[in-house]
Amino acid sequence: MNAARTGYRVFSANSTAACTELAKRITERLGAELGKSVVYQETNGETRVEIKESVRGQDIFIIQTIPRDVNTAVMELLIMAYALKTACARNIIGVIPYFPYSKQSKMRKRGSIVCKLLASMLAKAGLTHIITMDLHQKEIQGFFSFPVDNLRASPFLLQYIQEEIPNYRNAVIVAKSPDAAKRAQSYAERLRLGLAVIHGEAQCTELDMDDGRHSPPMVKNATVHPGLELPLMMAKEKPPITVVGDVGGRIAIIVDDIIDDVESFVAAAEILKERGAYKIYVMATHGILSAEAPRLIEESPIDEVVVTNTVPHELQKLQCPKIKTVDISLILSEAIRRIHNGESMAYLFRNITVDD
């Protein structure tokens, strides 16, 4: 390390054994020791964090993976960041491979943009930088008042396709829905493979026909000039499911950023099987797998589900041999090294497209 800069430490937020394991892999690659801290739940349910060594004037990196108990993991991260801030750490960088609440980054009716709220909370707790991977929406980076490095897992997943899928040249990249078409196209172009899109899978939201008016005058009942009436939207109809592209006699590789609704991937696999695909792979960066996921995957036409270790899924993997894991500790450790030494991050994005 550059002797002109301060030291650095890597801490695990200790939400799960998987978080500690990822932190150990990162520190081994960096040739560093894991910072000493204790994170535990008190008898009253509160989270307590104790930092067991001096961090004054150092760059601190907090590794936090997000298990199924999202809110506990978020509180662990916030409390640890605040503890390090009060201990006079120079910079506090959160290494959050899967950023929670990223699916709540848009306003929907009377909902809220929870992702923006979380960004504000992290800044208030003391974080000065975040390293994450494959944000669900790239616009989320604009929610933060400090730098966010959004790394990509696509080079690792592309390498897996080339090295672990026999006869991958006979494959076609599949988008489970039109929303995932750009990501699928990016994979298809770099592998020089065909592209298919499953259309009609997306569920339609219920149309709210109540206009919410309660105050006079009742304009709706008044005589108005033809053409000035507010147009009523037609009720949405769910289109029949179709596959745009040929998958007959091919290997189908479904790509997405998150697997959290396994049923939709199983349904897509069944459609592809009906269309003639003889092998089906599902690949995603984040595998947020429920307790039922192993059984659903095992009973489905899916041959393999390939995810990275951004989210803990060890128990599900033991229950289903179809689930495979790609380690991304290499890129996280290199990002930590470069940020601490003030080096450019451009090299980590050299094989990335805007649609990844």
UniProtKB/Swiss-Prot annotation:
Gene3D superfamilies in alphabetical order: 3.40.50.2020
Positions where Phosphoserine occurs in the chain: 177, 215
Residue(s) carrying N-acetylmethionine: 1
Keywords (A to Z) from UniProt: Acetylation, Nucleotide biosynthesis, Phosphoprotein
Keyword Ubl conjugation assigned: no
Disulfide bond annotation, renumbered to this chain: none
Gene Ontology biological process terms in this record: nucleotide biosynthetic process
Pfam families for this protein: Pribosyl_synth, Pribosyltran_N
A GO term for molecular function: magnesium ion binding
UniProt entry tagged with the keyword Acetylation: yes
Family that this chain belongs to: Belongs to the ribose-phosphate pyrophosphokinase family.
Entry function: Seems to play a negative regulatory role in 5-phosphoribose 1-diphosphate synthesis.
Subunit structure: Binds to PRPS1 and PRPS2.
Descriptive protein name: Phosphoribosyl pyrophosphate synthase-associated protein 1
Gene symbol of the encoding locus: Prpsap1
